[in-house]
Regions:
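Conserved alpha-helical substructure of the radical SAM core
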Residues: 154-181
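Iron-sulfur (Fe-S) cluster-binding segments and ferredoxin-like electron-carrier domains
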Residues: 126-137, 149-164
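Glycine-rich, proline-tolerant flexible connector loops at the mouths of alpha/beta enzymes
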Residues: 185-193, 247-254, 317-319
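Conserved glycine-rich "GG(E/T)P / GGGxP" loop and the immediately following alpha-helix
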Residues: 181-201, 287-292
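Short, ordered loop/turn segments at secondary-structure junctions
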Residues: 186-188, 219, 243-246, 312-313, ...
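Auxiliary Fe-S-binding modules of radical SAM enzymes
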Residues: 2-9, 13-14, 24-135, 167, ...
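Short cysteine clusters
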Residues: 122, 143, 147-150
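Hydrophobic residues within beta-strands of alpha/beta enzymes
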Residues: 181-183, 214, 239-241, 308, ...
C-alpha cells in the first residue's frame, strides 16, 4: 500500500491490493450473477470483477438506509457503486519498519511458515509485527473456497499436507516466547478431515515447547462434528470461528458456508464440557442493517459465543466484493456496548479490528498496559 509520511492512508483512493492473484478456476465454476437475495433491500449493479475470481457475484444486495446509518461519517460514510473512494481518516494504518517487525519476518521465513497477516493483507500487519506478534496460517496457501471478501488465493491443493509443519510451528512459537498464540488455516475441503488432524498436531507440538495460551481460528469443517471434536480434544484455550456477516448476505459473502452451520459449530464448542472459550467475528460495511446486526449478535450469544470482534470490511482488490459503507467509529462503539449488554465476556469493535487483533487482551491473557507478546 502507499501511504502518506504520517504512516496513514488519509485522503487516498481505496487501495487495489491485488498484487498476487489466485489461479483461474473458471473452467470448473461458472460466473454467478445475483439478482436478489432476501429482504430487506434491493440490488445495485457494481460491475463485473472478472477473472480470476469469476464466482464472485456481479451484484451486492443493499438494505434500505436507516436513520443513524453512517452516523457522523458525513460524505465519507456511504459509498455508491463506481464512485471515487476516499478512505476516511479513521482508517489510517501504520506501515511496517521496526526492528521487531524485521525479526518476526525473518523468524517466520526461516521456519517456512506463512502468516494470515500477509496472505489476507491485513491492515494491522505493521502494528502487530512491531509487537513481535503474528497469526500463523497452516495447511498451505491455497484455499479450496472462494469467498467474495477474502484475499487468500483460491486453488486446488490436491490433498497435499506438510506433516512437518506442526513441529516447525511449535519451535517458532517457543522461539518467539509468546504468551498468546493464534493459529489459523485456509479451508481444506479436499481433505477428508478438513485439516483437523494437523490443527490438533500443531496444538500438541506447541504444548510440548511452550506454556502459551493457544487460540485457533478454524474453518467450519463442512459441519462434521468429528473433525471439530478432534480440535476440541487437543484443548486450545480459545476456538474462533467467524460468522463474518449477517444471514441475508451469506450467499454472496460466504457462498460455500452457511450461517446456521457456523452457529452450530460455536454451540458445540460452548457445550463441549471444557473450559474452551468460543469466539467469533463480524465484518461490516457490506450492506447490513443495524437490525440485522442486532439479530446476529443475539444469535451468536444464544449459541454460546463469549468473545467477539467487529471490524470494517476493506476491499482487497477490484475482483472482490465492493465496500458499501465505511462505518463510523461511533457505530462500532455502539455495537460493542450492545454486545456487552447481551452478555458477551469481551468485545473488540472498531474499524481496524480483525479476528486476531490484540487477541491476548480480548481473551484476558494479559491486562491492558502489561508487556505482551501474542502470535
Amino acid at each position: 500500500m502507499s501511504a502518506s509520511e504520517d504512516h496513514g492512508m488519509s485522503a487516498s483512493e481505496e487501495p487495489d491490493m491485488s498484487a498476487s492473484e489466485g489461479p483461474d478456476m473458471s473452467a470448473s465454476e461458472p460466473e454467478t450473477s445475483l439478482v436478489s437475495i432476501g429482504e430487506p433491500g434491493s440490488t445495485h449493479d457494481v460491475g463485473v470483477y472478472g477473472a480470476p475470481r469469476p464466482a464472485v457475484p456481479e451484484r451486492v444486495p443493499l438494505a434500505p438506509r436507516t436513520k443513524g446509518c453512517a452516523s457522523g461519517a458525513g460524505s465519507l460514510g456511504a459509498v455508491e457503486p463506481g464512485e471515487f473512494r476516499r478512505l476516511p481518516p479513521w482508517l489510517k494504518i501504520q506501515l511496517p519498519g521496526s526492528g521487531e517487525y524485521a525479526e518476526t519476518k525473518a523468524l517466520l521465513k526461516a521456519n517456512r511458515l506463512v502468516t494470515v497477516c500477509e496472505e489476507a493483507r491485513c491492515p494491522n500487519l505493521g502494528h502487530c509485527w512491531a509487537r513481535g506478534t503474528a497469526t500463523i496460517m497452516i495447511l498451505g496457501e491455497l484455499c479450496t473456497r472462494r469467498c467474495g471478501f477474502c484475499a487468500v488465493a483460491p486453488g486446488r491443493p490436491n490433498g497435499h499436507v506438510d506433516w512437518d509443519e506442526p513441529r516447525r510451528v511449535g519451535e517458532t512459537v517457543a522461539a518467539m516466547n509468546l504468551r498468546h498464540t493464534v493459529i489459523t488455516s485456509v479451508a481444506r475441503d479436499d481433505l477428508k478431515d478438513g485439516g483437523s488432524t494437523i490443527f490438533a498436531e500443531v496444538i500438541r507440538e506447541i504444548r510440548k515447547r511452550s506454556g502459551t495460551v493457544i487460540e485457533v481460528l478454524i474453518p467450519d469443517f463442512r459441519g462434521h462434528a468429528d473433525d471439530l471434536r478432534r480440535v476440541i480434544d487437543a484443548r486450545p484455550e480459545v476456538i474462533n470461528h467467524n460468522i463474518e456477516t449477517v444471514e441475508r448476505l451469506h450467499p454472496v459473502v460466504r457462498p460455500s458456508a452457511r450461517y446456521d452451520r457456523s452457529l452450530e459449530l460455536l454451540r458445540r464448542v460452548a457445550d463441549s464440557g471444557t473450559e474452551i472459550k468460543a469466539k467469533s467475528g463480524i465484518m461490516v460495511g457490506l450492506g447490513e442493517t443495524d437490525a440485522e446486526m442486532t439479530r446476529t449478535l443475539a444469535d451468536l450469544r444464544a449459541h454460546g459465543c463469549q468473545l467477539l470482534t467487529i471490524g470494517q470490511y476493506l476491499r482487497p482488490s477490484k475482483m472482490h466484493l465492493p465496500v458499501v459503507e465505511y462505518v463510523h467509529p461511533d457505530r462500532f462503539a455502539a455495537w460493542r456496548d450492545e454486545a456487552l449488554a447481551m452478555g458477551f465476556e469481551s468485545v473488540a469493535s472498531g474499524p481496524l479490528v480483525r479476528s486476531s487483533y490484540h487477541a491476548d487482551l480480548l481473551a484476558g491473557t494479559v491486562k491492558p498496559g502489561e508487556a505482551s507478546k501474542a502470535g
